[in-house]
Amino acid sequence: MKKILFIDRDGTLVEEPFDFQVDSLDKIKLTSGVIPALLQLQKAGFTFIMVSNQNGIGTVAFPEEDFAVCHEFILDLFSSQGILFDEIFICPHTPEDNCICRKPKTGLLEPYLKETAFAKHYSWVIGDRDTDKEFADNLGVNFLPISKTHTWEMVVSAIINDARKASVQRKTKETAIDLSVQLDSDQTSVIDTPIPFFTHMLEQVAKHGGFDLRLQASGDLEVDEHHLIEDTAIALGEAIRTALGDKWGINRYGYTLPMDESLACVAIDISGRSFCDFKGQFTREFVGGMATEMVPHFFQSLSSALGATIHIEVTGTNHHHMIEACFKVLGRALRQACSRTNNYLPSTKGVL
């Protein structure tokens, strides 16, 4: 589904003039940073919709031709930089007209909204007034302000850099997992499980994956460590899948990593199709309190929850090194596959 930015015009795309009316070309001045910001957002796959209140178009105080000349100039200016608006909605009424189309009301967009499927969670209203925030609330989407203290650069950071995060709480009779990921943050992860070696392995995934991982996990270790490791893998897969959103612009594919005498190879495809093939032989039953049979099971559970194809092969003689190499290489593969380097969805199907 579409990710839409509903963008105000005056005070957001162009500076608001002293008399609050853009009716001559000498009043037109772009807001600081708007061009590079919109180019970044356009590259990230967002659709632009302009929605603006223009008081009294067609009246003596605001002749229609004065509005049209300035409006076309603004559109041509953005178009010259490769920035296009899919739709433009202008309310020409005054507040006294009590119309159904003036923001924060949504009447102007009703026909469009009925015909257009869009992802509300990934859509925003960007504007400079309280009415824009009310408009966002009425649409059921997010809101970001434009002001002297909240710039277009901050808007881009909020939408793109902070968007790829998710939290999962998984509580069963066997385990309690509280996990969150932020894919575009390299803060030091905080991971707490009752199996120190497993904690260390997850730290490797986050560190080499280049993302922030917060995890609090507990479970019925008096029975077996199986449930804890399995449910953690499921929660991690669900969180990464959710944080990726529509997967627009990701590499999708991703790695080979040596560790001393051990070598681990991972091929990953975040395709929406779950499959896991693990090749490796462990002759020890446990390493650091973690059953070695749970290593392939971790990857199988992750693959299922993430919706990814994962092939992994590991060789070596030191089991600690072999397992650590597996988790490190998983992190590197996720970093490569989840990174945004394209301005398209990497699939001929149009969906992942």
Curated annotation (Swiss-Prot):
Chain residues that bind Zn(2+): 91, 93, 99, 101
Ranges for region Histidinol-phosphatase: 1-163
InterPro entries associated with the record: HAD-like_sf, HAD-SF_hydro_IIIA, HAD_sf, His_synth_bifunc_HisB, HisB_N, Histidinol-phos, IGPD_sf, ImidazoleglycerolP_deHydtase
Annotated binding of Mg(2+), by residue: 8, 10, 128
SUPFAM superfamilies, sorted: HAD-like, Ribosomal protein S5 domain 2-like
Active site: 8 (nucleophile), 10 (proton donor)
Annotated localization: Cytoplasm
Family named by the database record: In the N-terminal section; belongs to the histidinol-phosphatase family. In the C-terminal section; belongs to the imidazoleglycerol-phosphate dehydratase family.
Protein name from the UniProt record: Histidine biosynthesis bifunctional protein HisB
Organism: Legionella pneumophila (strain Paris)
